């Protein structure tokens, strides 16, 4: 090695100390168990490295990275509008929140937040609240299955199917639809969709009541969840925990109330809290939040008025009032006639807008929305070009997984499953 050479040493930091201590321990007293990444109770490809003594968890570590997609890096090579098709695939159980957070950031950089049409904000809120219900249904269904309650799983996924079918009829896709766009939405609601949404809401009430009847006062369910996965307010504050976990400590923190966006200040709903700081409280919060979401969707239907679904500035937005063609590429006869029927300059402008993208002024912003799992934040940096310089997501699943050790160490292995289920992590959001 010469004086001009640099040697970089990559170490495991505190993990090295754990390994050294493990080598000196009595092998008969401690066992290291890998739970996952292929395990039915880890909510995806989550690896849990557990040190156990008998049935007691003495140490718990999360191993992540098995679902890494490089989405944040890919955004640096795509136009601002194209980014929506990437971010919708991160937390795949709540794609509309990913899309909305991204679009709110772009709109804030462009300075057009106050120009977004009222109909757009109503549609965004409605889609997010429907998505919140579907996400909570998966959380409760999967959590029930992991604890041996199979009937709630069937009820939850059957109810979720109602919402996914609704998404398909509105956006064309059940999941990852890239429906929310900077400046508006991809296309307006079809004429009969408000009636269909109202019917879906009516159909959801029965399975939600059934879910509560099955679990709320179930003695076995309460024995498995009460006083399990305990994390108090001080622990949540120290770890940056948000969402139902934080609200289970009694703190009514909800960005829809504290920092409203998309017109949430115009809707009447309650922030659901609990005071047990345990898995049962988080379960009850999710159950009651679904009913609050139904109230918000009903208010959205009342507030839905005719109007544009994209900002009027054609230098920034694609025409959203045009019907999509049968090939899904947007080249319906109406689309072609409107773009080519005005002038050659209009056609050239539309071509450049699609092929080169919009230019976003240089700057950086942070925006956050209240996702089903907590605060979903986006730190967005623009250098003034047609592509983002950097987009970083603060995904609540990533942050909330820090609580696994605090919730489970000192408890039983079976209670670890309950703790992870109450966190409700989605690995697509963790491994971006």
UniProtKB/Swiss-Prot annotation:
Family that this chain belongs to: Belongs to the complex I 49 kDa subunit family.
Record-linked PANTHER family: NADH DEHYDROGENASE [UBIQUINONE] IRON-SULFUR PROTEIN 2, MITOCHONDRIAL, NADH-UBIQUINONE OXIDOREDUCTASE 49 KDA SUBUNIT
Keyword RNA-binding applies: no
EC numbers for this chain: 7.1.1.-
Catalytic activity annotation: a quinone + NADH + 5 H(+)(in) = a quinol + NAD(+) + 4 H(+)(out)
Protein's recorded name: NADH-quinone oxidoreductase subunit D
Subunit structure: NDH-1 is composed of 14 different subunits. Subunits NuoB, C, D, E, F, and G constitute the peripheral sector of the complex.
Protein purpose: NDH-1 shuttles electrons from NADH, via FMN and iron-sulfur (Fe-S) centers, to quinones in the respiratory chain. The immediate electron acceptor for the enzyme in this species is believed to be a menaquinone. Couples the redox reaction to proton translocation (for every two electrons transferred, four hydrogen ions are translocated across the cytoplasmic membrane), and thus conserves the redox energy in a proton gradient.
InterPro entries: NADH_Q_OxRdtase_suD, NADH_UbQ_OxRdtase_49kDa_CS, NDH1_su_D/H, NiFe-Hase_large
Keyword Transcription: no
GO molecular function, one term: quinone binding
Main subcellular localisation: membrane
UniProt superkingdom: Bacteria
Topology of this chain in the membrane: Peripheral membrane protein
GO cellular component: plasma membrane
Keywords: Cell membrane, Membrane, NAD, Quinone, Translocase, Transport
Any coiled-coil regions, as ranges: none
SUPFAM superfamilies assigned to the protein according to its UniProt record, in alphabetical order: HydB/Nqo4-like (SSF56762)
């Amino acid at each position: 090695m010469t004086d001009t050479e640099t040697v970089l040493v990559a170490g495991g930091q505190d993990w090295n100390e754990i390994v050294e201590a493990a080598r000196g321990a009595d092998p008969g007293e401690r066992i290291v168990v890998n739970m996952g990444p292929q395990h039915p109770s880890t909510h995806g490809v989550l690896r849990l490295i557990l040190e156990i003594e008998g049935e007691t968890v003495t140490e718990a570590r999360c191993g992540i990275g098995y679902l890494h997609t490089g989405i944040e890096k890919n955004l640096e090579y795509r136009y601002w509008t194209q980014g929506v098709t990437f971010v919708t695939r991160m937390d795949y159980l709540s794609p509309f929140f990913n899309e909305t957070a991204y679009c709110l950031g772009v709109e804030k950089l462009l300075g057009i937040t106050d120009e977004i049409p009222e109909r757009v904000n109503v549609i965004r809120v409605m889609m997010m609240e429907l998505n919140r219900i579907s996400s909570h249904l998966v959380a409760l269904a999967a959590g029930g299955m992991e604890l041996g309650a199979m009937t709630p799983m069937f009820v939850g996924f059957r109810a979720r199917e109602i919402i996914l079918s609704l998404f398909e009829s509105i956006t064309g896709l059940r999941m990852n639809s890239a429906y929310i766009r900077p400046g508006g939405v991809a296309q307006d609601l079809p004429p009969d969709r408000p009636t269909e949404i109202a019917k879906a809401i009516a159909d959801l009430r029965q399975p939600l009541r059934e879910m509560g009847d099955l679990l709320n006062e179930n003695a076995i369910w309460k024995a498995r969840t009460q006083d399990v996965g305990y994390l108090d307010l001080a622990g949540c504050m120290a770890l940056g925990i948000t969402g139902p976990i934080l609200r289970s400590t009694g703190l009514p923190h909800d960005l829809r109330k504290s920092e409203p966006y998309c017109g949430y200040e115009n809707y009447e709903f309650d922030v659901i809290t609990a005071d047990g700081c345990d898995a049962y409280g988080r379960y009850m919060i999710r159950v009651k939040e679904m009913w609050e979401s139904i109230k918000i969707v009903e208010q959205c239907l009342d507030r839905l008025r005719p109007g544009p679904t994209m900002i009027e500035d054609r230098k920034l937005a694609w025409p959203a009032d045009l019907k999509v063609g049968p090939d899904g590429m947007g080249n319906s006869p109406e689309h072609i006639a409107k773009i080519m029927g005005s002038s050659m300059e209009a056609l050239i402008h539309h071509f450049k807008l699609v092929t080169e993208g919009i230019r976003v002024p240089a700057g950086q912003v942070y925006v956050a929305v209240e996702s089903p799992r907590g605060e979903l934040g986006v730190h967005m940096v623009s250098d003034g070009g047609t592509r983002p310089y950097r987009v970083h997501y603060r995904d609540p699943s990533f942050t909330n997984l820090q609580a696994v050790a605090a919730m489970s160490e000192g408890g039983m292995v079976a209670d670890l499953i309950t703790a992870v289920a109450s966190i409700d992590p989605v690995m697509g959001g963790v491994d971006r």
